[in-house]
A protein has these predicted regions:
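Structural signature of alpha-helical solenoid repeat scaffolds
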Residues: 11, 47-48, 84
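N-terminal interaction modules that seed assembly of large macromolecular complexes
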Residues: 29-50
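N-terminal "cap/leader" segments of large eukaryotic alpha-helical scaffolds
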Residues: 1-29
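Amphipathic alpha-helical scaffolding segments comprising HEAT/armadillo-like alpha-solenoid repeats
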Residues: 18-31, 54-67, 89-96
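Ordered, amphipathic secondary-structure segments that act as subunit-interaction surfaces
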Residues: 76-82, 86-88
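Short inter-helical turns and helix N-cap capping residues of alpha-solenoid HEAT/ARM repeat scaffolds
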Residues: 34-35, 71-73
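Residue-level detector of extended alpha-helical repeat arrays and alpha-solenoid scaffolds
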Residues: 3-6, 39, 76
Length: 96
């Protein structure tokens, strides 16, 4: 799948909130994708999912937090945003 096709697929997933929780493992796997654009979208979706299902994303919090030190500003911003959304859902989930 090309980056463009994958980004479009993630855009479709964005609109289908009922699928978010079941797609968490897939989204987490995209955190290692070569494209910053795809990783940024995955971070955003994990954050939004974590607001509603914080315990379901808990195991992925360390991977999300690792992007706070990324050289890419977009990935740092998305990671901080995701952690904030997850913490809003359940603060203990993001406590170190």
């Amino acid at each position: 799948m090309t980056e463009k096709e994958l980004y479009k697929e993630l855009g479709t997933l964005t609109k289908n909130r009922d699928q978010w929780e079941e797609r968490i493992p897939y989204l987490a796997s995209l955190l290692s994708h070569e494209s910053d654009r795809i990783r940024a979208k995955a971070l955003w979706l994990l954050g939004e999912t974590g607001l509603v299902h914080p315990l379901s994303v808990k195991e992925h919090v360390p991977a999300i937090a690792s992007f706070c030190g990324s050289p890419a500003a977009l990935l740092r911003e998305r990671a901080v945003n995701a952690l904030g959304r997850i913490g809003r859902g359940s603060f203990p989930v993001i406590e170190a």
